[in-house]
């Protein structure tokens, strides 16, 4: 009986972990902070920063895109790490 209960506990923990979805901030520049659940098995959040005629611009989201010269990017792997 104890073995059965222990087995069920382990299976429950493993199944709950398989449904995990990374959560990243996705607001742009000075917008109100918002978050989104990443899809497609994304394992990274990013924060991209660059300067244009309006000043510094910031973009946040899921993934870790490649960027052009002059654009600063920080990628991370934990929930809401890209604030």
Swiss-Prot record:
**Expression by tissue:** Expressed by the venom gland.
- Localization, UniProt: Secreted
* Record keywords: Acetylcholine receptor inhibiting toxin, Disulfide bond, Ion channel impairing toxin, Neurotoxin, Postsynaptic neurotoxin, Secreted, Signal, Toxin
Taxonomy, superkingdom: Eukaryota
Q: Main localisation, per the record?
A: secreted
- Please list the GO terms describing molecular function: acetylcholine receptor inhibitor activity; ion channel regulator activity; toxin activity
From the UniProt annotation, give the residues forming the signal peptide. Answer: 1-21
Query: May I have one GO cellular component term?
Result: extracellular region
- Which Gene3D superfamilies does this one have? CD59
Q: Give the disulfide map.
A: 24-45, 38-62, 64-75, 76-81
> What function does this protein fulfil?
Binds to muscle nicotinic acetylcholine receptor (nAChR) and inhibit acetylcholine from binding to the receptor, thereby impairing neuromuscular transmission.
| Family designation | Belongs to the three-finger toxin family. Short-chain subfamily. Type I alpha-neurotoxin sub-subfamily.
Q: What is this protein called?
A: Alpha-neurotoxin NTX-3
Question: What species is this protein from?
Answer: Naja sputatrix (Malayan spitting cobra)
Tell me the organism's taxonomic lineage. Answer: Eukaryota, Metazoa, Chordata, Craniata, Vertebrata
